[in-house]
């Protein structure tokens, strides 16, 4: 068994959260299903991996995720209920127990989505993002893997934004401790690659890339080498979406993928309104 694979079944963390089972393991944390003994509600308990306990940047990202998300309350943002340190000095987060799939896993299975479904997912993500930005926070790592699709009573799943580990205050530094641009290059806005301070419109570019991918089956820019991908974000025009797709949706994608923030939507609410109007034309 590795140093990170400790059987924690039955452990009570923070005198309140009794671990039931290991349900996932990411690059930074182990995720457990746990029972909140105070409310009798199941939650997800994320504990930083022991192998990262001596990594300052990993601990900073993990703690930032908790601090940022704990302040945000919206149905399209995964809730963080509590943060703390175990008796063994391990940082942990208590978060909403999500039972759905990521948009990434759905796209792997289905390749592309219907215009109505893609528009709904993007609209919901923008609803959550508006609250994030109103709080003065930028997500900085929006991508299909960070959009959870949760079962809901209606025909379309609930979208929940997750993973705020790279989030920062608007106008704050744009680099990690190692001095490199953070986030996933496939979804990153050109101004961040130019070394400019991002704002909320940088996140809108990422939503534009995701919407393009949902409608076409692939992101607008792909390359085998990082420098080629960077140059494409900076200089290349995105390929045209299929002409059979609704014109209103194609226009929204083009607007969101503008190379300069001033040419995009003013904020998440404005882009959401455009999507809402476009949805009225969809069959």
Outline where the language-model segments fall.
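Activation segment signature within eukaryotic-like protein kinase domains
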Residues: 121-122
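Protein kinase catalytic-loop region centered on the HRD/HxD motif
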Residues: 126-137
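A short, aromatic-enriched beta-strand patch in the conserved N-lobe beta-sheet
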Residues: 82-84
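Conserved short submotifs of the Hanks-type protein kinase catalytic core
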Residues: 88-102, 106
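C-terminal lobe helix-coil module of Hanks-type protein kinase domains
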Residues: 186-283
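Protein kinase glycine-rich loop
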Residues: 20-26, 31
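AlphaC helix of the eukaryotic protein kinase fold
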Residues: 49-71
């Amino acid at each position: 068994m590795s140093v990170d694979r400790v059987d924690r079944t039955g452990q009570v963390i923070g005198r309140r959260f009794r671990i039931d089972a290991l349900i996932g393991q990411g690059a930074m944390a182990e995720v457990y299903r746990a029972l909140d003994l105070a409310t009798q509600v199941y939650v997800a308990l994320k504990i930083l991996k022991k192998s990262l306990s001596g990594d300052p940047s990993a601990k900073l990202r993990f703690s930032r995720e908790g601090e940022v998300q704990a302040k945000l309350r919206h149905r399209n943002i995964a809730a963080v209920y509590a943060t703390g340190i175990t008796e063994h000095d391990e940082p942990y987060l208590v978060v909403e127990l999500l039972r759905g799939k990521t948009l990434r896993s759905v796209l792997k299975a289905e390749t592309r989505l219907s215009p109505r479904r893609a528009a709904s997912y993007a609209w919901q993500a923008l609803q959550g993002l508006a609250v994030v930005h109103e709080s003065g926070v930028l997500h900085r790592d929006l991508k299909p893997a960070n959009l959870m699709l949760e079962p809901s009573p209606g025909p379309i799943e609930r979208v929940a934004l997750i993973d705020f580990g790279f989030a920062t205050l608007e106008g704050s530094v744009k680099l990690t401790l190692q001095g490199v641009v953070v986030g996933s290059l496939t979804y990153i806005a050109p101004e961040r690659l130019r070394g400019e301070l991002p704002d909320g419109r940088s996140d809108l570019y990422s939503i534009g890339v995701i919407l393009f991918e949902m409608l076409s089956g692939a992101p607008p820019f792909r390359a085998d080498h990082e420098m080629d991908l960077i140059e494409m974000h900076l200089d290349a025009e995105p390929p045209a979406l299929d002409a059979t797709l609704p014109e209103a949706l194609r226009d929204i994608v083009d607007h969101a993928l503008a190379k300069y923030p001033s040419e995009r939507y003013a904020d998440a609410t404005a882009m959401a309104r455009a999507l809402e109007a476009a949805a009225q034309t969809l069959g």
